[in-house]
């Protein structure tokens, strides 16, 4: 999930990157710090930590904030039904051009989601919810889609300080600046606290420095 189409600089930058038009995408963090946004990461091979996590997926799979859908497309090759979900139409179109077979151009909590067995919130995509309350709502929506025994695969990077970091950010690409938006960076303990009211329980976790990869399920043991 990214910004509205008229200001969808991330989606536009992804499309340009895939076509070989390599211009830097910047992430402006209020009140003024600017960071390079690594577009190559959206197209990188799946890592060993990600593979270990994706081995736990059961179909149908809902890939939330899929972007070019590198995880969903990998699961397709394993014979699983994988649905890419993104608010960015350019990202959805790009994922389709790269081979994604099923997609949904929508926000995860804007309406009923297709039934799923596994939901993906990888690459820190819980942050798309913007706030702790928004994250709790997103986790509830995914629990409703997955149902009893459903699985949630999450990865991200813990903040330098504390369990949660709420930020206001915007994308800057070429001569354009997107709208300011809320972003949430959550460490694994915070993710588990936010997920617990919806019934999600930790089943597997791995860490490497500040990065983490975790699998949760809805109450039913595996």
Stretch-by-stretch model annotation:
Residues 88-89:
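Conserved SAM/SAH-binding beta-strand->alpha-helix loop
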Residues 116-135:
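A short SAM/SAH-binding and catalytic strip from SAM-dependent methyltransferases
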Residues 99-109:
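Conserved SAM-binding strand-loop segment of SAM-dependent methyltransferases
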Residues 135-148:
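A short glycine-rich, Lys/Arg-flanked "PGG" loop and its adjoining helix->strand segment in the class I
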């Amino acid at each position: 999930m990214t910004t509205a189409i008229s200001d969808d600089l991330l989606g536009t930058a992804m499309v340009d990157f895939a076509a070989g038009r390599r211009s830097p995408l910047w992430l402006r963090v209020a009140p003024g710090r600017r960071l390079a946004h690594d577009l190559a990461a959206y197209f990188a091979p799946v890592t060993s930590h990600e593979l270990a996590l994706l081995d736990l997926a059961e179909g149908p799979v809902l890939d939330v904030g899929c972007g070019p859908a590198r995880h969903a497309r990998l699961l397709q090759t394993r014979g699983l039904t994988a649905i890419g979900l993104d608010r960015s139409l350019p990202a959805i179109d790009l994922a389709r051009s790269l081979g994604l077979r099923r997609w949904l151009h929508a926000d995860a909590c804007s309406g009923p989601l297709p039934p799923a067995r596994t939901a993906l919130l990888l690459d820190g995509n819980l942050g798309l919810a913007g706030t702790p309350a928004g994250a709790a709502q997103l986790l509830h929506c995914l629990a409703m889609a997955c149902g009893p025994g459903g699985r949630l695969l999450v990865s991200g990077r813990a903040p330098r300080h504390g369990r949660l970091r709420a930020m206001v950010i915007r994308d800057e690409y070429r001569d354009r600046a997107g709208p300011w938006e809320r972003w949430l960076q959550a460490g694994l303990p915070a993710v588990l606290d936010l997920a617990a009211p919806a019934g999600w329980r930790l089943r597997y976790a791995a860490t490497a420095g500040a990065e983490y990869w975790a699998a949760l399920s809805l109450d039913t043991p595996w």
